[in-house]
Curated annotation (Swiss-Prot):
InterPro entries hit by this protein: ADP-Glc_PPase (IPR011831), ADP_Glu_pyroP_CS (IPR005836), GlgC_bac (IPR023049), GlmU/GlgC-like_hexapep (IPR056818), NTP_transferase_dom (IPR005835), Nucleotide-diphossugar_trans (IPR029044), Trimer_LpxA-like_sf (IPR011004)
Keyword Transferase belongs to the record: yes
Primary role: Involved in the biosynthesis of ADP-glucose, a building block, required in the biosynthesis of maltose-1-phosphate (M1P) and in the elongation reactions to produce linear alpha-1,4-glucans. Catalyzes the reaction between ATP and alpha-D-glucose 1-phosphate (G1P) to produce pyrophosphate and ADP-Glc.
NCBIfam families xrefs: glgC (TIGR02091), PRK00725.1 (NF001947), PRK00844.1 (NF002023)
Keyword terms: ATP-binding, Carbohydrate metabolism, Glycogen biosynthesis, Glycogen metabolism, Nucleotide-binding, Nucleotidyltransferase, Transferase
Family from the record: Belongs to the bacterial/plant glucose-1-phosphate adenylyltransferase family.
Top-rank taxon: Bacteria
PANTHER family, A to Z: GLUCOSE-1-PHOSPHATE ADENYLYLTRANSFERASE, GLUCOSE-1-PHOSPHATE ADENYLYLTRANSFERASE-RELATED
Catalytic reaction equation(s): alpha-D-glucose 1-phosphate + ATP + H(+) = ADP-alpha-D-glucose + diphosphate
Record has Isomerase as a keyword: no
UniProt-listed Pfam families: Hexapep_GlmU, NTP_transferase
Record protein name field: Glucose-1-phosphate adenylyltransferase
Length: 404
């Protein structure tokens, strides 16, 4: 039995998330609440911790206070055993400048790698919804002999132009890596599908350090992991693709096996929530064998009074539904829906209140939004467009703390 390698986790969590505005007006994208009890960053942290990778640095920058607080309050590991999940803000260690890209974030944080001296480094994004066992990907990386392994998910070739696409040979060596090509390549075994990058990488430590340092000296680089570092290593013949469909997570169902969602737009964020609410959900939050850990608030259970009901919905702790109807929706903690109100096909974040007789349809309400008695959201889009953001798919998004 071979000795377990020493692995350091680096989570890239500095994303601004402009396409998720107004949800990112006051917080970093990885801190956006999701699924009634979580933040987006909880998915990658849960995957790493479940795989027993317990030394993790989270690189932050943009409006990181709520993210830093969430990690410090909910992701405490045992310091006695040398375990940690620590947020690392941009520190200007190399001069008076902030991170200029994801690769520059690692370059400015090389001291973390030198201090830990790992054999391998997993560099994962912080804003995707999925379950994955990273240890299987690390094993694949070691066996492949590659310098970097890129996690790839298969999508229909016709839909792949929106992503970074991977062209690999039969052995899994990446021949080309192209951002949003007009003609995406097929996979070696299926010309109708394309490997697209999940933004998750496993590096042999020396390979990452050398590539990051070389990139830092390149004045023409954008200092981006996917745009600069990976193509550099592909050109050197050092990159392999890991087929995410081969990843086997304990307790996964046939429906949510290999589930992965990039929730970088309001429509994608909304659709991922709708994946949670059916009787047999596309993504199952209730897998006890590979749990997603989130907020650890001490709240009372949700309560339904005066005939209030919720159908095909997720309702968070501390919420009260009073003589109201909730359907096909995700409600976070401490949400109140008052008498006669109707909530349909919506995502309601913590502390929001829907007043007596109000109607909320096909909408996202951020934290502490108050919809007054008799008010309507998502019913008249022309009226809503004067006040709120509306996605291309017609989802109405109301920013944090707004009173309607």
């Amino acid at each position: 039995m071979r000795e377990a390698p020493h692995v350091l986790g680096i989570v890239l969590a500095g994303g601004e998330g402009k396409r998720l505005y107004p949800l990112t007006a006051d917080r970093a994208k990885p801190a956006v609440p999701f699924g009634g009890a979580y933040r987006l960053i909880d998915f990658v942290l849960s995957n790493l911790v479940n795989a027993r990778y317990l030394r993790i640095c989270v690189l932050t920058q943009y409006k990181s206070h709520s993210l830093d607080r969430h990690i410090s309050q909910n992701w405490r590991l045992s310091g006695l055993a040398g375990e940690y999940i620590t947020p690392v803000p941009a520190q200007q260690r190399l001069g008076p400048r902030w991170y200029t890209g994801s690769a520059d974030a690692i370059y400015q944080s090389l001291n973390l790698i030198y201090d830990e001296d790992p054999d391998y480094i997993v560099v994962f994004g912080a804003d995707h919804v999925y379950r994955m066992d990273p240890e299987q990907m690390v094993r694949f990386h070691i066996d492949s002999g590659a310098g970097v392994t890129v996690a790839g998910i298969r999508v229909p070739r016709a839909d792949a132009s929106a992503f970074g696409c991977i062209d690999a040979d039969d052995a899994g060596t990446i021949r080309d890596f192209v951002e949003k090509p007009l003609e995406p390549p097929g996979t070696p075994d299926d010309p109708t599908s394309t490997f697209v990058s999940m933004g998750n990488y496993v590096f042999t430590t020396k390979v990452l350090i050398d590539a990051i340092r070389a990139d830092a000296d390149d004045d023409h680089s954008d200092h981006d992991m996917g745009g600069d570092i990976i193509p550099r290593l592909v050109a050197d013949g050092m990159a392999a693709v890991y087929d995410f469909s081969n990843n086997e997570v304990p307790g996964a169902t046939d429906r949510d096996r290999a589930y992965w969602r990039d929730v970088g737009t309001l429509d994608a964020f909304y659709d991922a929530h709708m994946d949670l609410v059916s009787v047999h959900p596309v993504f199952n939050l209730y897998n006890k064998r590979w749990p997603i850990r989130g907020e650890s608030e001490n709240l009372a259970p949700a309560k339904f009074v005066n005939g209030g009901s919720a159908q095909e919905s997720v309702v968070g702790a501390g919420s009260i539904i009073s003589a109201a109807s909730v359907r096909n929706s995700v409600l976070s903690s401490n949400v109140v829906v008052e008498d006669g109100a109707i909530v349909e096909g919506s995502v309601i974040m913590p502390g929001a209140r829907v007043g007596r007789g109000a109607v909320v349809r096909h909408a996202i309400l951020d934290k502490n939004v108050v919809v007054g008695p008799g008010e309507m959201v998502g019913v008249d889009l022309d009226k809503d467009r004067e006040r709120f953001a509306i996605s291309a798919g017609g989802v109405v998004a109301v920013g944090k703390g707004v009173w309607i």
